[in-house]
Amino acid sequence: MGLCFQLNLASLSLILFSSFPGLLAQSQQHFLGQNNTSLLSGGRCNLARGKWVYDSSYPLYSAFSCPFIDSEFNCQKAGRPDTNYQHFRWQPFSCPLPRFDGANFMRRMRGKKIMMVGDSLSLNMFESLACLLHASLPNAKYSLRRSQPLTSLTFQDYGVTINLYRTQFLVDVVQEKAGRVLVLDSIKQADAWLGMDVLIFNSWHWWTHTSGLQPWDYMREGNQLYKDMNRLVAYYKGLNTWARWINNNIVPSRTQVFFQGVSPVHYDGREWNEPLKSCNGQTQPFMGQRYPGGLPLGWVVVNKVLSRIRKPVHLLDLTTLSEYRKDAHPSLYNGISKDLDCSHWCLPGLPDTWNLLLYSSLTS
């Protein structure tokens, strides 16, 4: 996402914020107190507040031994010369974050189906979880079936299937006479998400793409066709369609639902007080007390929607801990192009911590 569009999006966001006065402060206070906590040792632990510490026992697996990493995330194979980014561990201030135990994960999830639903950030998290499990249980038999939009990884000895359903917006994109239409109030593809024991959703980055990078020509809500609209408003409408689907279709005793949270980008060094820089060449996390760039605008929308949803949805609030990791992107070592990638994440790397948050929630 380019800087020009980020600035344009910021100005357009005023329309959304004028509709929800005090939204950012209220959401931050509410969710830092509730959704980011996990029950550990009989108390409540806030996993979202902490710092990155160097740990020589990391990474938890090797980029060269995990068979699931796509070239776009395999930064070492693509020639990245430094490895420090692999050795940082997230340490919450109030408690330790449990270390990943693949055998325990499999015992808890035996016979269950997990599905991650979203874009390439969901792919990032899916491949990380696959690598963590493979490293913990290297002799476990597995089968992998890749297709579009569904990829399935089954660990046969445990009856555990981890699915990835690729969708950029959660709501539908359909071909109509006018062209490709992003339908803000339609979610027919969600039939494929039924029957899961665990669902982890994600969507944000594609809502900000413009011009040739956006995979639609028009937006539609009801019978009204739009050439474009405020992207935060569109995102809010789309997420509300998803929330209605959750309310109407999820039985909490059968299915646990998570929202992956908003993954930040690091194209603009002004966000961490290094003007004119990007993620390229970064070798250390941001170590300050508070990230200068603040929270992404999408984070505000996510929290607004989750605050009103009737069914339980646990927010994996990975945003702040990920904002500190300006060093953890593929940058120029993405294996597929010469374009700078400050959006996705190297593996092993930051998404392993996302999965530690998930692991903590599933096993605590």
UniProtKB/Swiss-Prot annotation:
Membrane-crossing residue ranges in chain numbering: 9-25
InterPro entries from the UniProt entry: TBL, TBL_C, TBL_N
Source domain of life: Eukaryota
Location(s), subcellular: Membrane
A Pfam family of this chain: PMR5N
Free-text function comment from the UniProt entry: May act as a bridging protein that binds pectin and other cell wall polysaccharides. Probably involved in maintaining esterification of pectins. May be involved in the specific O-acetylation of cell wall polymers.
Family label: Belongs to the PC-esterase family. TBL subfamily.
Protein name (record): Protein trichome birefringence-like 40
